[in-house]
Amino acid sequence: MRMYSSDAHERPPSPSLGTTPPHPLPPTGSPRPRQDSAAGNSEEREPRGLRRASGVGSSCKRPTVCMGRQQGLPFCTVCGYRCSSPERTRGRCAVGKVRVAGGGGAPGGGAGMRCCGCRERNINKELELF
């Protein structure tokens, strides 16, 4: 009987191990709806982000540029970045980013001007053409 009882003690742990995986399944099932609800929340957040991205992406990449355009501050018509300093002076605008070129800055509103870097580059390009 002792061995039978020891067998009985050995058997319940193995079935308990077998029953343990089903127990995690309901908890994993409960987080799944939570993930769905989280996904629902993220879906609600994504359109907001898309709205911001669409508004920001269509006009410019940096919010400071958008703020500058909304306030009517001068911005570079070539690179699209806000240029706090006039032409031929060093400003904060990025020289190498010409992705917005082709009217990316002009339709945004505000006073259009070329930043120092784009001005110098355009002068160099014009000199190369001549």
Curated annotation (Swiss-Prot):
Superkingdom, taxonomy of origin: Eukaryota
Bias kind Pro residues: ranges: 21-30
Protein encoded by which gene: LINC02881
Region (Disordered): 1-62
One Pfam family this sequence matches: DUF5558
Record's protein name: Uncharacterized protein encoded by LINC02881
